[in-house]
Amino acid sequence: MLFQTTQAHEELRAKIRAFAEEEVKPIAFSLDQANEFPAEAVKKLGEMGLMGIPYPKEYGGAGLDAISYAIAVEELSRVDGGTGVILSAHVSLGSWPIFAFGTEEQKQKYLVPLARGEKIGAFGLTEPNAGSDAGGTETTAVDKGDHYLLNGGKIFITNAPKADTYVVFAVTTPDIGTRGISAFIVEKGWKGFEFGDHYDKMGIRSSSTAELIFNDVKVPKENLLGKEGEGFKIAMATLDGGRIGIAAQALGIAQGAYESALEYSKERVQFGKPIAAQQSLAFKLADMATKLRCARFLIYSAAELKEHHAPYGMESAMAKMYASDIALEVTNDAVQIYGGTGFLKGMDVERMYRDAKITTIYEGTNEIQRVVIASHLIGKISKGNEGGSRSVAKKPAPITGVRKRQIFRDGESKDKVAALVEALKKDGHDFTVGIP
């Protein structure tokens, strides 16, 4: 698909870029050093109507499309990857499941304040034994009649403990795997719901990340999201869309590093000329720009498919995988272009280099993205009943023995064809299937 954004998209980009340059970039280094959440900037994003950018106005959103959302995450991440993922996790993970699977009452109670930016959302799926394999979920929700009793914990939860509303996944029916997982809307402040320490991360340090702890938390029956047993389906559908946000975050980080390196290469003089004039470095810049454009096309095309309710799971996995892979490459090249200066704390490219790494890990590692893509291309191969072996469709037996060079000479043409068909059937072939 040849893709071109609209004038409205580019006007939105300019608006968010101006905000990011004025409100986020000047404090990005201090946020990183202090491991500090940009509360004031997030509040202003809500006032600008950007915390509910892809949701209908009737639910407090801006009523814009999925590409607009990707642009918003991209532009924030261009100056600070942590701020970008705050928006991504809030919109894609904390709000979208309620929009897509919630009742009207749940949407009015929870989605509206989330979309208006009055509250922050988060998504509780990952556990110590349930990372890439969500089927390892151990948090439980036991039906107690008028409520569920929630026990367990979640780790690496983006926006915790700053978020007010959490979509949490727990086992309601044990011993049946992913079919026994359900989703719930849980509020901060409920008795028994506590938080672990804020993680001290390598990158995206302005993004708050913490552990969720549930000790006999009473969850009202009306806070079940979807139906019992639909939790895994809700989680996977949510992650499909969330990968567009993480891809946009990775792209934004890489874009910021590229722009900084490009500008520096024009100013830095060695051997009597700007280093950008050195062919080896110019080629590096050309490769960086090409990777950025490829990533942007993948992201926007996946967002376009999502917007038009077309299947997009494979495309969002491709976008997330590729954008995060090239983010590592581009930020690495940016540090290399800066040389020793780029290795110093306080340099944007040094921070971006650290920020980029997480994009290959969360919302499905890039190894998992390749599994997702391959499953779309190849299809599912069912497990055999014994020894974990795979069963595949039985292939027709090859023509061997006397028929390998058999020539049908007897009878008229129709008799020869009939004899050939019978011989093929005996060998497992049947090209008459489907012929009336």
Residue ranges, per PLM feature:
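A short, Trp-centered hydrophobic/proline-enriched beta-strand micro-motif
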Residues: 117-125
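Long, acidic (Asp/Glu-rich), low-complexity accessory segments flanking structured domains
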Residues: 215-233
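Flexible, small-/acidic-enriched active-site or ligand-binding loops
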Residues: 136, 191-220
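A short core secondary-structure module
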Residues: 146-195
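Thiamine diphosphate
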Residues: 394-436
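Short Gly/Pro-enriched turn/cap motifs at secondary-structure boundaries
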Residues: 114, 129-132, 156-159, 173-175, ...
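Short Ser/Thr-interspersed hydrophobic loop/turn segments at strand-loop and sheet-helix junctions
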Residues: 49, 73-77, 170, 186-191, ...
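Alpha-helical interface subdomain recognition
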Residues: 1-89, 101-106, 113-118, 131-134, ...
